[in-house]
Amino acid sequence: MAMSNNTPSTQDILHWLIQWGEDHDAVRAMLLTSSKANPNASVDIFSDYDVVLVVPDIHPFYEDRTWLLDFGEVLVVYWDPIYPMPGYGIEQFANVIQYADGLKIDFTLWPVELFRQIAQAPVLPADLDIGYTVLLDKDHLTDGMRAPTHTAYIPTPPTNETYQKVVEDFFSDAPYVAKCLWRDELLPAKWCLDYDMKHLFLRPMLEWRMEIDHRWSVPAGNLGKGLKKRLPPEIWAQLEDTYAGAAIADNWEALYRTLTLFRRVAMDVADHLSYAYPLDLDQRVTAYVQEMQHLEPGGVNRRPIR
């Protein structure tokens, strides 16, 4: 089946899900979560449906997976293993289903026992606090449940300790990237530069910088997908310039541009929060990386590079 140009409306799909839940006795409650339940989120034709199914026993749904076919022809599916929910210790699982007609549903299955505890908790889990809509509740399980605040995943100001750790960890990766580039080892260099340095350390710094302009009130989005809309355009342009193709020389330039951008943004954050940016660490690591780049193969450095 090809992706359909006549995609059913959101209300049609929700009606379909509710009817399916009503027809299956094991489904005691059903909740819609994430972007389609958050009035502050933007949605488009590719926005998926995040659905929580509350059932007496999750194992039959895990072991016999034919129920997924009730919603259409499955193109591809990913299954999480069954694992205990952090903070509760009760088993749950989730799956991600892309249907051939374009519909995408992410199901999370919670046993009734787990959901009762969540519904009665003083604080909602982030996945519910970001937004939820009760689609079906056969046993009044959601009675008295807290309303979502839609504030989950909004970054908060880092402590000085957290800020300094992000800066130190970012610069600790730079010599490794340089070593891989010097050795013409593209894959580990790109992994460390484009994932480790950028997503683990530069992205949080960019999110903090974004929040400075928005008074710590807006979510950055999963993997920073909201940054382009909310960062100053010149900072976003600098970020784009940190991405390179496969040429080693271009990746050396990308590394230096990443260092420059991080320095700029981290200094902005430090100034706003009255923290001290470790400029000495920055300068020493940058100089060391430059020295690594210009080593001749087989050359001897003042200190061995392993």
Annotate the PLM regions.
Residues M1-L32:
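Helical scaffold of the NTase/Pol beta-like nucleotidyltransferase catalytic core
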Residues L14-W16, S35-A37, I90-F93:
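Short alpha-helical segments and helix-capping/turn motifs at coil-helix boundaries
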Residues Y153-R306:
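Conserved nucleotidyltransferase catalytic core and NTase-mimicking acidic/glycine-rich helix/loop elements
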Residues Q19-D23, N40-I45, V96-I97:
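Short secondary-structure boundary/capping segments within folded domains
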Residues T33-L68, G72:
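Catalytic metal-binding acidic patch
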Residues V43-I45, I118-A121, A220:
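Short aromatic-enriched loop/helix-cap "lid" or pocket-rim segments at secondary-structure transitions
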Residues A2-N6, F71-P188, L193-D194, H294, ...:
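Conserved NTP/Mg2+-binding pocket subregion across the NTase superfamily
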Residues A37-N38, I58, V112-L114, E211:
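Short, solvent-exposed loop/turn segments at secondary-structure junctions
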